[in-house]
């Protein structure tokens, strides 16, 4: 069963490339958080921004008893100069998404779109974690209490 439409896939690619062009270091992911929040809003998913400074947490709640699952994507880029020559290469000097976090964000937004339409029972918590690259973002997400 193919549940990822061509349109959703293309939208995920656009999101990934947009984030890739404008990478942000740990705890500076404000533009990335705004993109995430807007995309989730478009899907009808309420998100809480500013978690662990620049993180975003959202919940897909079916109102039906079932398992609670958390899905996580890291958001931050690293301090390295991109020299790929890609049309969507980083426009920020000395900062790049070399670890794929731009793709992780796009994929979690895509998963959210699918789950919002297909989840029948239980809940899914969507965690967009800042500062994964050694800056303690995961600990700050845990301390926020939003995963309780």
Tell where the protein language model's regions lie, with residue ranges.
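Acidic/His- and Gly-rich active-site-bordering loop/insert found
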Residues: 2-97, 106, 110-121
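Membrane-interface loop-to-helix entry segments
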Residues: 99-101
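Acidic/histidine-rich catalytic neighborhood of metal-dependent amide-processing enzymes
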Residues: 103-148
């Amino acid at each position: 069963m193919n549940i990822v439409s061509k349109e959703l896939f293309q939208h995920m690619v656009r999101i990934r490339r947009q984030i890739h062009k404008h990478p942000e270091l740990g705890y500076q992911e404000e533009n990335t958080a705004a993109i995430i929040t807007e995309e989730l809003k478009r899907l009808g998913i309420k998100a809480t921004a500013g978690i662990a400074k620049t993180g975003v947490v959202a919940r897909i709640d079916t109102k039906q008893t079932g398992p609670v699952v958390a899905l996580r994507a890291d958001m931050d880029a690293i301090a390295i100069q991109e020299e790929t020559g890609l049309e969507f290469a980083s426009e920020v000097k000395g900062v790049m998404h070399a670890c794929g976090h731009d793709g992780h964000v796009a994929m979690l937004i895509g998963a959210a779109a699918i789950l919002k339409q297909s989840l029948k029972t239980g809940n899914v918590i969507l965690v967009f974690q800042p500062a994964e690259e050694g800056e303690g973002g995961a600990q700050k997400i845990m301390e926020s209490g939003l995963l309780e």
